[in-house]
Every structure is written in C-alpha cells, then in structure tokens.
From Swiss-Prot:
N-terminal signal peptide: 1-20
Disulfide partners: C29-C68, C33-C64, C40-C56, C47-C53
GO biological process: neuropeptide signaling pathway
Species assigned in the record: Nematostella vectensis
Protein name: Protein Aeq5-like1
Lineage of origin: Eukaryota, Metazoa, Cnidaria, Anthozoa, Hexacorallia
Length: 88
C-alpha cells in the first residue's frame, strides 16, 4: 500500500514539474520576442509616434510569437503521441 501511495505522489510531482518547465519555456520564448521587439524602440527615438516603429514591432514580434506557439503545439503533440504509445 505504501508503494502505491509513493508512486501516486511521485506521479503528481513529475506532472507538476513538467507543467512548470513547460510554463518556463513558454515565458522564456515570449520574453525573447518582447526583447527583440524592444530593439525596434531603441532604433527609433520617436517610437510611440512612428508608424515605422509599429511596423517594425509587428514584423518582429508576431512571427516570433507564432514560433513560440508552434513550439508549444509540437511539444504537446509529441507528449500525446508518447502517452498513446505508453498505453499500448
């Protein structure tokens, strides 16, 4: 009985750790996008008034954010595939 409880506790810890790691990677990816888009602001002193700055941010941030989304989607698909293999 103790071994069953130990396995359940370990499973919960691993699930929580995996979720936290995923969240950290997601946050790191988004922060990288934000940092890259800030370069637009540093290159344009009138950033908040400038259409070119807004265009720069959209051209940098949107594709970067989409890459983060794709990374997350692929990771989730891989986990589902691995979980399916474990069941069979």
């Amino acid at each position: 009985m103790k071994s069953v409880i130990a396995v359940l506790v370990l499973s919960l810890v691993l699930v929580n750790f995996t979720q936290a790691a995923k969240d950290d990677r997601w946050k790191a990816c988004r922060m990288k996008c934000y940092t890259e888009s800030k370069l637009c602001m540093n290159n344009d002193s009138k950033c908040f008034d400038s259409q070119s700055c807004n265009s720069c941010i959209q051209q940098v941030y949107s594709p970067c954010f989409n890459r983060c989304q794709e990374m997350l989607r692929r990771r989730e698909a891989f986990k589902r595939m691995f979980a399916f293999d474990e069941e069979n």
